[in-house]
């Protein structure tokens, strides 16, 4: 069973292990998360922002967040998503993403992602992303 918990005060239990896994796959997003958290630059505290940890049993299986997108007024950005290899293909990223989307203010649900994340978007029903320089017609 997968349990989602908000991350508010400190990095979640098991963060060092998930960070090592990400680094071993040459992903640096969790190093950036740790650095930004420690400096206070990003704590996911603005209205609509959230960082969620996904646990399988008591093991940290995944993490993901949503922040205010400064490039577009009223928009948000999915970021710092990672699911540990043994827990992939179990719907954890989908659960994280949907929970984060449900927590956004209903007035505006424009969400941006890094273009390299497009292959992960279809399973949650959001389709391919446009480049950040493209605008809706």
Regions found by a protein language model. Give the residues of each.
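Conserved catalytic-core motifs of GNAT/GCN5-like acyltransferases
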Residues: 112-114, 127-137
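Hydrophobic alpha-helical core bundles mediating ligand binding, dimerization, or RNAP-core interactions
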Residues: 15-26
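Short coil/loop residues immediately preceding or within conserved phosphate-binding loops
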Residues: 48-49, 73, 78
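Conserved beta-strand in the GNAT
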Residues: 53, 59-68, 77, 82
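Conserved beta-strand-loop-alpha-helix junction that forms the acyl-donor binding cleft
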Residues: 88, 111-125
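Active-site rim helix/loop that mediates acceptor-substrate recognition in acyltransferases
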Residues: 27-53
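Conserved acetyl-CoA-binding loop-helix of GNAT-fold acetyltransferases
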Residues: 83, 89-102
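Conserved N-terminal entry element of GNAT/NAT acetyltransferase domains
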Residues: 1-17
């Amino acid at each position: 069973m997968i349990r989602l918990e908000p991350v508010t005060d400190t990095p979640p239990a098991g963060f060092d292990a998930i960070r090592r896994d990400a680094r071993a796959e040459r992903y640096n997003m969790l190093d950036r998360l740790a650095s930004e958290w420690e400096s206070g630059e990003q704590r996911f505290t603005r209205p609509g922002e959230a960082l969620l940890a996904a646990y399988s049993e008591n093991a940290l299986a995944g993490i993901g967040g949503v922040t205010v997108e400064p490039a577009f007024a009223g928009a948000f950005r999915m970021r710092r998503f990672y699911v540990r290899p043994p827990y992939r293909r179990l719907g954890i990223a989908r659960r994280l993403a949907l929970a984060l989307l449900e927590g956004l203010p209903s007035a505006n649900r424009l969400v941006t992602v890094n273009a390299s994340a497009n292959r992960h978007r279809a399973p949650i029903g959001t389709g391919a992303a446009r480049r950040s320089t493209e605008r809706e017609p």
